A protein has these predicted regions:
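Bacterial N-terminal signal peptides that target proteins for export
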Residues: 2-12
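Beta-strand-rich binding/interaction modules
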Residues: 495-518
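Hydrophobic residues within beta-strands of alpha/beta enzymes
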Residues: 94, 234-236, 379
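Loop/helix patches that line or flank the sugar-binding groove of alpha-linked glycan CAZymes
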Residues: 36, 48, 52-53, 264-270, ...
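Generic enzyme active-site microenvironment
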Residues: 141-142, 235, 277, 340-341, ...
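Acidic/aromatic-lined carbohydrate-recognition and catalytic surfaces
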Residues: 29-220, 224, 228, 239-287, ...
Length: 543
């Protein structure tokens, strides 16, 4: 398929963007709002030749990031205006949750895969954002919802009405075998004509039938459309559910892995540089199979998320050590894993590791673990400020407006925000934390910079030191041709002492280590180091 029509469309839309002055998007921020982050030089040419799995990504729920038109809903112009902040933080890639038209605020039930939700902006806004992001050296990954559409999508409307072409794009049955969906109820829903249709999540999200080659081709065309416009890749939503098994399995069936392999291979025939990361919400051996058997570029490491969070909660490194060793054994060489400590579906990191009120010290510890251990970190917007969940179990409480300023509204919008902020604490804001070396934000900025400075942190293997107290984590990050880095953390709430001799591991020498991250390590006079409570340090050979 020729890319020329898409390129022509892109040129026309970009011209419209420039004519409307979108490159001056910062001027559209609410009065008094500040743009944080130092001036950013153009990215080096080698940035784009590097592995897209390198660097640090940032997940943006666009609706909650920055509003520029006063309607209380974050938009693409707002995201464009905040790119200097993200680049100044050291971020190298962005994952945007769905930005397509949808009847739902979250966007995971799409009605038009080739358009921008009008509440978030226009296609011209998106292209202006995309060019600006690339100008700051940021890759852009979009959410691609392939498993299901909205029940209001024209495809499903036609299918439900009996259109013979689209009827086979979904799964209808007169008397289907019982099947339990992902949320516990029946996966079959009344179509209103004596039949039922499959929707593994909810009735408003009917499953597309990817056993039909026309459906696969339609989604390949959607992906190619966005890649032609300049998008760098996709996060495949619900990747483990796309094709059900013949035995009724709704997740990780052999046919599903075959679909992942085929979809990736066919997409790269048209776009060799396309980058795919999967929402692999499953066990480590099963995730490894998506790499080994299906060639997935990157998975999300849900098992590591669980043990990272629980390690800080329980002040114990035992399960985290075991998971790191399991990962070293389970994944094939070169498998990229997206790591995270929060996202739009999980409790925010600050809420997960705090008790009655946000505990910045433990939030920093969790963030530094994320940024020092193997994988490609994905930072959920606001986690770098210790933004907590709002009250209650509503998923919207994990997706509240970003706090830019120390004001009650946080500088998100000049109007009434679409959802209340999770906190009005002035200390939890970019304005309050930027430049404060004791803040969570500056701890994240420093940890991201250290990761970029030491290749072993970004791409190295993990060699776990075993014979240590339960609350001490010691992991050597090693990479051929590069100096090793020791990640040393005290997860407990009291100071501990560790002797260098305790940190020996196969292939690495604990002698002659110096701190790589600032202040010297205090000792007790006998050669042991004192590790303060809730602290992570990075050490390496003296250069």
């Amino acid at each position: 398929m020729s890319r020329r029509p898409a390129r022509c469309l892109r040129a026309l839309l970009l011209a419209a963007a420039l004519a409307s002055g979108l490159t001056a998007a910062q001027a559209a921020l609410p009065a008094g709002a500040l743009v944080y982050g130092p001036p950013v030089a153009p990215p080096p040419a080698e940035r784009w030749a590097s592995d897209p799995g390198d660097g640090v990504y940032y997940q943006v729920f666009v609706r909650s990031f920055q509003d520029t038109d006063g309607d209380g809903i974050g938009d693409l112009r707002g995201l464009t205006a905040r790119l200097p902040y993200l680049a100044g933080l050291g971020i190298t890639g962005l994952w945007l949750t769905p930005i397509h038209p949808s009847p739902s605020y979250h966007g995971y039930d799409v009605t038009d895969y080739r358009a921008i939700h009008p509440e978030l902006g226009t296609m011209a806004d998106f292209l202006a954002f995309l060019d600006a992001a690339h100008g700051h050296g940021l890759r852009v990954v979009l959410d691609l919802v392939v498993n299901h559409s909205s029940d209001r999508h024209p495809w499903f409307v036609a299918a439900r009405a009996g259109d013979p072409r689209f009827r086979d794009w979904y799964r209808f049955a007169s008397d289907p075998e019982p099947l339990i969906g992902t949320l516990g109820g029946s996966a079959w829903h009344d179509a209103g004509d004596g039949t039922r249709y499959l929707g593994l999540f909810v009735a408003e999200m009917p499953d597309l039938d990817h056993r039909n080659p026309e459906v696969v081709q339609a989604m390949l065309d959607v992906a190619a459309f966005w890649l032609d416009l300049g998008v760098d890749g996709f996060r495949i939503d619900a990747i483990q559910h796309v094709v059900e098994g013949e035995d009724g399995a709704i997740a990780n069936a052999p046919a599903n892995l075959a679909w992942v392999a085929e979809f990736g291979a066919r997409l790269r025939e048209r776009h060799p540089g396309a980058f795919l990361v999967g929402e692999t919400w499953t066990s480590t051996p099963t995730i490894a199979a998506y790499h080994r058997d299906a060639g997935l570029d990157m998975s999300f490491d849900y098992p590591l998320w669980r043990v990272l969070t629980s390690a800080v909660q329980a002040r114990s490194a035992i399960d985290l050590r075991a998971q790191l060793e399991l990962n070293e054994d389970a994944y094939p060489e070169g498998a990229r894993r997206g790591t995270f400590v929060g996202n739009h579906d999980q409790p925010r990191a600050a809420t997960a590791v705090s008790l009655l009120r946000v505990d910045p010290t433990r939030v920093v510890l969790l963030g530094r673990l994320l940024l020092a251990l193997p994988g490609t970190p994905f930072v959920y917007y606001g986690d770098e400020l210790a933004m907590p969940n709002g009250p209650g179990d509503d998923d919207r409480q994990k997706r509240t407006p970003m706090r830019w300023t120390a004001t009650e509204g946080g500088g998100f919008s000049a109007g009434q925000p679409w959802f209340p902020p999770s906190t009005t604490d002035p200390a939890i804001s970019v304005e309050a934390q930027a430049g404060d070396p004791a803040s969570v934000l500056e701890a994240y900025r420093s940890a991201i910079a250290l990761r970029a400075a030491y290749p072993a942190l970004a791409r190295g293997n993990a060699v776990v030191v075993r014979d240590l107290p339960a609350s001490v984590l010691a992991v050597w990050r090693t990479l051929a041709g590069e100096a090793p880095v020791l990640v040393l953390a005290n997860l407990s709430n009291r100071d501990l002492e560790v002797a260098p001799a305790q940190l020996a591991a196969p292939g690495v020498d604990p002698g002659g280590l110096v701190p790589l991250d600032g202040a010297p390590l205090a000792g007790d006079g006998s050669g042991a180091w004192s590790l303060p409570a809730n602290t992570l340090r990075l050490l390496g050979p003296a250069r």
